[in-house]
């Protein structure tokens, strides 16, 4: 509640008149400060905070007197070049400055940073209260400041007793407790009612100095007390540590435009104040004149319909009141100084109706038929073009080649009725929105989609196809049509009538294994048991491709990014863009080298002959990733061991493989079991393909490792001397 502004009654006006008449011969009334200079040549912002006159930064013409001087200092924290404003006379950082606004706010407001008094919050055990800043004191000759009743004394913590000091009239305070009971102190903030927090009002006489003292009334822990503005009160006031760490709170100071000379006749911006203290009407601003603490003061504010700074000449600017909605419902709004008026709208005389409308109606009907016919023709042409384009794209995207492959394939299982239209897939993927992207690969981009029936799908949109890549796309369709295995991604259908070919797969929700292994932000860390199961499932899928499918299929790009994980973290082998099938009697393929560095078989790289053992080598790298949790290529490792396979083989050779085991599984895994898998990985990474096991042997070995841990040591001891690994205990 703000204090009323007292105005002069006749007796006070008479006394002032006598004083002015007696003093007119002795002294000349002082001129008003140069408000013009203060507005044109002075900096009016500091650190993003507006500094309105009578406050100012710079020379003496920029502010009324020393009480209103603001210094713009560089801050010691935060980003370089940041500045903060300080009130020079009281040496406090300014948070906000506002001018009086009409009759409802009869003084201006300055928000400053105030101190926090704490007890038991620092590392030392001293029970002496600590203050982040000195107590607030705005006293002094000519001081226009006072502490408003918008502030509250607040105590936070268990058993915290806070008292206001430096107030002569009374002793005020409050006490908080951790017992769930209501405080007897009158409060208005229901979040601070005595439980862990209490508050007390500031006395209404507007003191200029208030100190805060804190005492412990029982209980340990951090306790704080402070004076704070209700406007800047935090939402959670039950945690004392956050106030102690912050080091300050915001305090509201009221200020008057004060002067000690009652002969100060004219205000800075308003010229309507009379000699006796009353004011005239009709100007852009108003001023009030009275007494407070035996000091004459004057507050000015812009009149209704004006905004700005009344302490500057011409500082109050007329508002355009006609910008508001529905100002004049039945007329035209005209802005006038300080308000607006509503002028009646001119009457509109409607033209007389034509006597003959037949010609106009006939013309409109003819135009309508012409428009309808034109639109129908345009629709027909567009539909025809779409059909031609669809046929063209179907042919260009390998539709004819696909039909030819299907007719020459002994066991083709592709259901040609599962061809999707482009409109279906656009609707399912929100027109292939970037928000739907699941991943990008060498062959194209994969989107998440949802069909009309609610089924979730993965849509692989190939890159712009040229003749060289067309065979790879058709090859992937043919290969996936021949595969029926629970650990291999299932092909649902395809779309060939778009500019770029599209494949539709079953949706695998948990993404690829590479991200789950190497993304540190992933909350789920795969256990050794899960990793071993994934390895067995991958081995089973590759065994099926190599020996159980209609034709042996070599994947040619086995890596963790091409291994997806379903909702139960089951493995699904994907991305068959570079895969090749061979006849039963073929032992290898001679092709251009394709694959991913870090996973590529060195024997294949040198000879360009890809065999089933090349897939085994890539599988060995995946096993090492599961064991170590490291990436296949890393700049962190030495130049010689930058590749994970080389790094792992050196560790096996030096009997220190235990040192490179993933720390996330090191403690919970069975060491004998893990070492047996490491030995299998070493065999898969043999430089010569003939020394590597085939995928069926690797799959059976992994099954044996999981199901028969008692036989592991015997198998390890029976290895060749070259591959032997010493037993390494956790100790």
Swiss-Prot record:
Its EC number is 2.7.11.-. Residues 27-360 are extracellular. Disulfide bonds join 287-300, 322-333, 328-342. Residues 382-731 are cytoplasmic. Residues 285-342 are annotated as: Atypical EGF-like. Glycans are attached at residues 37, 43, 73, 96, 124, 137, 236, 272. CDD domains: EGF_CA. The modification Phosphothreonine is found at residues 591, 596. Residues 432-705 form the Protein kinase domain. Residues 709-731 are annotated as: Disordered. InterPro entries: EGF_Ca-bd_CS, Kinase-like_dom_sf, Prot_kinase_dom, Ser/Thr_kinase_AS, WAK, WAK-like, WAK_GUB. It catalyses: L-seryl-[protein] + ATP = O-phospho-L-seryl-[protein] + ADP + H(+); L-threonyl-[protein] + ATP = O-phospho-L-threonyl-[protein] + ADP + H(+). Residues 1-26 form the signal peptide. Preferentially expressed in roots and flowers. Serine/threonine-protein kinase that may function as a signaling receptor of extracellular matrix component. May be involved in plant's response to pathogen infection. This is Wall-associated receptor kinase-like 5. It comes from Arabidopsis thaliana (Mouse-ear cress).
């Amino acid at each position: 509640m703000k204090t009323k502004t007292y105005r002069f009654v006749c007796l006070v006006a008479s006394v002032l008149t006598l004083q002015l008449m007696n003093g007119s011969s002795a002294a000349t009334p002082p001129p008003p400060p140069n408000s013009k200079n203060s507005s044109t040549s002075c900096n009016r912002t500091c650190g993003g905070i507006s500094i309105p006159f009578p406050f100012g930064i710079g020379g003496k013409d920029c502010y009324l007197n020393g009480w209103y001087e603001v210094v713009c200092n560089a801050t010691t924290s935060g980003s370089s070049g940041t500045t903060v404003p300080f009130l020079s006379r009281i040496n406090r950082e300014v948070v906000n400055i506002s001018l009086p606004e009409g009759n409802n706010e009869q003084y201006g407001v300055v928000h400053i940073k105030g101190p926090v008094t704490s007890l038991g919050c620092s590392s030392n055990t001293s029970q002496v209260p600590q203050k982040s800043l000195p107590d607030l004191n705005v006293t002094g000759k000519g001081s226009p400041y006072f502490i408003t009743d918008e502030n509250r004394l607040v105590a936070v913590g268990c058993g915290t007793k806070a008292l206001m000091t430096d107030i002569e009239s009374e002793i005020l305070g409050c006490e908080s407790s951790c017992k769930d009971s209501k405080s007897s102190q009158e409060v208005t903030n229901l979040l601070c009612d005595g439980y862990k927090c209490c508050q007390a009002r500031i006395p209404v006489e507007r003191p200029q100095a208030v100190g805060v003292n804190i005492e412990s009334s029982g209980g340990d822990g951090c306790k704080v007390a402070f004076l704070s503005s209700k406007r800047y009160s935090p939402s959670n006031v039950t945690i004392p540590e956050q106030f102690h760490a912050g080091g300050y709170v915001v305090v509201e100071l009221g200020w008057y435009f004060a002067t000690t000379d009652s002969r100060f006749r004219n205000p800075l911006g308003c010229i309507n104040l009379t000699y006796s203290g009353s004011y005239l009407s009709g100007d852009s601003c108003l001023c009030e004149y009275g007494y407070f603490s035996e000091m004459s003061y004057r507050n000015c504010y812009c009149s209704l319909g004006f905004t700005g700074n009344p302490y500057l000449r011409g500082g109050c600017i007329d508002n355009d009141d006609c910008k508001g909605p529905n100002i004049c419902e039945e007329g035209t709004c005209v802005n006038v100084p300080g308000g607006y008026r509503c002028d009646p709208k001119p009457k509109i005389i409607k033209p007389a109706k034509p006597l003959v409308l037949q010609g106009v109606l006939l013309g409109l009907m003819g135009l309508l038929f012409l428009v309808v016919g034109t639109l129908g023709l345009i629709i027909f042409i567009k539909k025809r073009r779409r059909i031609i384009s669809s046929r063209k794209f179907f042919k260009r995207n390998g539709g004819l080649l696909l039909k030819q492959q299907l007719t020459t394939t002994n066991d083709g299982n592709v259901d040609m009725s599962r061809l999707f239209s482009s409109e279906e897939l656009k609707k399912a993927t929100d027109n292939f929105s970037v928000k739907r992207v699941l991943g990008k690969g060498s062959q194209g981009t994969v989107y998440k989609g949802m069909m009309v029936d609610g089924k979730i799908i993965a849509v692989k949109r190939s890159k712009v196809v040229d003749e060289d890549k067309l065979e790879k796309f058709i090859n992937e369709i043919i290969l996936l049509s021949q595969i029926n295995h629970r650990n291999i991604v299932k092909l649902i259908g395809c779309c060939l009538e778009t500019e770029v070919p599209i494949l539709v797969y079953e949706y695998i929700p948990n993404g690829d294994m590479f991200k789950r292994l190497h993304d540190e932000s992933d909350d789920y860390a795969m256990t050794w048991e899960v990793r071993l199961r994934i390895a067995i499932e991958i081995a089973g899928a590759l065994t099926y491709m190599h020996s159980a499918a209609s034709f042996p299929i070599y994947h040619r790009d086995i890596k963790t990014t091409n291994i997806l994980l379903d909702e139960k973290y089951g493995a699904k082998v994907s991305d068959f863009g570079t895969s090749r099938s061979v006849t039963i009697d073929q032992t290898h393929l001679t092709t251009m080298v394709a694959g991913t560095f870090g996973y590529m078989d060195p024997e294949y790289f040198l000879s360009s002959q890809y065999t089933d053992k090349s897939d085994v080598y890539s599988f060995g790298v995946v096993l090492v990733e599961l064991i170590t949790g490291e990436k296949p290529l890393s700049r962190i490792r030495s130049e010689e061991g930058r590749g994970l396979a080389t790094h792992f083989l050196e560790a096996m050779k030096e009997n220190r493989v235990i040192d490179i085991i993933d720390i996330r599984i090191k403690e919970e895994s069975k060491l004998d079991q893990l070492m047996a898998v490491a030995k299998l990985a070493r065999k898969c990474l043999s430089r010569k393909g003939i020394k590597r096991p085939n995928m069926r042997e690797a799959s059976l070995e992994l099954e044996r490792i999981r199901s028969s841990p008692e036989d592991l040591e015997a198998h390890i001891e029976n290895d060749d001397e070259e591959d032997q690994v010493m037993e390494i205990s956790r100790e």
